[in-house]
Amino acid sequence: MLKIAMIGCGAIGASVLELLHGDSDVVVDRVITVPEARDRTEIAVARWAPRARVLEVLAADDAPDLVVECAGHGAIAAHVVPALERGIPCVVTSVGALSAPGMAQLLEQAARRGKTQVQLLSGAIGGIDALAAARVGGLDSVVYTGRKPPMAWKGTPAEAVCDLDSLTVAHCIFDGSAEQAAQLYPKNANVAATLSLAGLGLKRTQVQLFADPGVSENVHHVAAHGAFGSFELTMRGRPLAANPKTSALTVYSVVRALLNRGRALVI
């Protein structure tokens, strides 16, 4: 049995608990949350993981088999780095956090000090295995194009680029590097950061973002070229019922990673 400490129990974390409910190989027996979210966390835990303890920090002498982060960027430094330094393997969903200068190196160094490993999840995008394999032979270009309905860009710099309320055709709100995209649109950085880390890096991965009234879901398109040949991938992601801003595939990515840790045969 694999015993897991989960950081965060919002839309992603609660959905993970639900999907793992009743699994005898993988058990979430610790859930780490912040004080202001404790009440709703305890409700979700009571329903889907009644034997789990709700904590605000992992004690220094507490050593789960695995830590999974489902809490957002701030949890990386607060919880994941200390766990890695203590030798506890970790799984990270908030890959966009690694767009910040030095964050990827911080995680890698913590894992090296703890003689363990941190796994970055593919989340809402597919093809990461192919892209990472292609990098071995040499990549020439990776271009990511993201499309969302105009209203999904409310509260972002896109509001200064165009009138989101009156768009009738797709409008490009950003065209540049993944590094620049992460700075301007940090809440939309996970997919671009994941592709960058698997492929050419933040500076060389190209990103185009569109506010598109013709789509009702998040559309991801990846085009990669290199010594291996080329590939193109288009995904139309449905949102999580509990949180329209979160991809359902992100939750499934977490569950798959955890189940793989507890099973003898994985793919």
UniProtKB/Swiss-Prot annotation:
<dbReference type="GO" id="GO:0050661">
    <property type="term" value="F:NADP binding"/>
</dbReference>
<dbReference type="GO" id="GO:0009435">
    <property type="term" value="P:NAD biosynthetic process"/>
</dbReference>
<comment type="function">
    <text>Specifically catalyzes the NAD or NADP-dependent dehydrogenation of L-aspartate to iminoaspartate.</text>
</comment>
<feature type="binding site">
    <location>
        <position position="190"/>
    </location>
    <ligand>
        <name>NAD(+)</name>
    </ligand>
</feature>
<dbReference type="InterPro" id="IPR005106">
    <property type="entry name" value="Asp/hSer_DH_NAD-bd"/>
</dbReference>
<dbReference type="GO" id="GO:0051287">
    <property type="term" value="F:NAD binding"/>
</dbReference>
<dbReference type="Pfam" id="PF01958">
    <property type="entry name" value="Asp_DH_C"/>
</dbReference>
<keyword id="KW-0662">Pyridine nucleotide biosynthesis</keyword>
<keyword id="KW-0521">NADP</keyword>
<protein>
    <recommendedName>
        <fullName>L-aspartate dehydrogenase</fullName>
        <ecNumber>1.4.1.21</ecNumber>
    </recommendedName>
</protein>
<feature type="binding site">
    <location>
        <position position="124"/>
    </location>
    <ligand>
        <name>NAD(+)</name>
    </ligand>
</feature>
<dbReference type="GO" id="GO:0033735">
    <property type="term" value="F:aspartate dehydrogenase activity"/>
</dbReference>
<comment type="pathway">
    <text>Cofactor biosynthesis; NAD(+) biosynthesis; iminoaspartate from L-aspartate (dehydrogenase route): step 1/1.</text>
</comment>
<keyword id="KW-0560">Oxidoreductase</keyword>
<feature type="active site">
    <location>
        <position position="220"/>
    </location>
</feature>
<dbReference type="InterPro" id="IPR036291">
    <property type="entry name" value="NAD(P)-bd_dom_sf"/>
</dbReference>
<dbReference type="GO" id="GO:0016639">
    <property type="term" value="F:oxidoreductase activity, acting on the CH-NH2 group of donors, NAD or NADP as acceptor"/>
</dbReference>
<dbReference type="InterPro" id="IPR002811">
    <property type="entry name" value="Asp_DH"/>
</dbReference>
<dbReference type="Pfam" id="PF03447">
    <property type="entry name" value="NAD_binding_3"/>
</dbReference>
<keyword id="KW-0520">NAD</keyword>
<dbReference type="InterPro" id="IPR011182">
    <property type="entry name" value="L-Asp_DH"/>
</dbReference>
<comment type="similarity">
    <text>Belongs to the L-aspartate dehydrogenase family.</text>
</comment>
<dbReference type="InterPro" id="IPR020626">
    <property type="entry name" value="Asp_DH_prok"/>
</dbReference>
